[in-house]
Amino acid sequence: MAGHSKWANIQHRKGRQDAARSKLFSKLSKEITVAAKMGDPDPEKNPRLRLAVKEAKSNSVPKDVIDRAIKKATGGDAENYDEIRYEGYGPNGVAVIVETMTDNKNRTASTVRSTFSKNGGNLGETGSVGFMFERKGEVTYPASVGDADTVMMAAIEAGAEDVESSEDGHVIFCADTDLNEVSNALEAELGESESTKLIWKPTTTTELDLEGMQKLMKLVDALEDDDDVQRVTTNFEASDEVMAQL
């Protein structure tokens, strides 16, 4: 299984879940508000908002929180956020992309830079690691929807590019611009997905041992603790033996 899928499994096992959950709700709400403010407040007419609402629901964000986030955008009292992407290297040369939404660019740049340097990494220029990733759409399904062949056929029909199937489930990739269309076609065939989102998919990975993984997790945890940070993507790879010890 590729590194980006393993990260979800680590987060699932980590003990910081309650605090992390409330922070996640707040980040997902912010994405909903920004998406609704930039386009139509109806998710059916606004693909970005539809994805934001879907991601919130798949993370068990309550409906009233979702509705409130949309209402905040339409009520005119939503803050203005800049979306800024930072790129750098973590411990052992792992590539790291940090996506932020901020109402104060100087504060965010300073915090992100300091977090990298305090945790064995260094912040680079935009584009310094981006070439090691591709922007893709990702749709995930549980293993219970069908075997690998069934899901592969549905994915081909839907216009997807690639499928990774394992005992943990199915991960379907498509061009970033096709995500809305592909996810609709998949849902017509396989039912509602577990998650549908845009991701940075590593094209090259860096293998880490246990110590390297522990250092990387420390950096990612520190970055994700910043309220301005929406998501962090890395290109680590680690063996199942290493993952089992985390």
UniProtKB/Swiss-Prot annotation:
GO terms for molecular function: DNA binding. It comes from Ruegeria sp. (strain TM1040) (Silicibacter sp.). It is found in: Cytoplasm. Keywords: Cytoplasm, DNA-binding, Transcription, Transcription regulation. HAMAP family: Transcrip_reg_TACO1. GO terms for cellular component: cytosol. Pfam families: TACO1_YebC_N (PF20772), Transcrip_reg (PF01709). GO terms for biological process: regulation of DNA-templated transcription. The lineage of its organism: Bacteria, Pseudomonadati, Pseudomonadota, Alphaproteobacteria, Rhodobacterales. Residues 1-21 are annotated as: Disordered. This is Probable transcriptional regulatory protein TM1040_1893. Belongs to the TACO1 family.
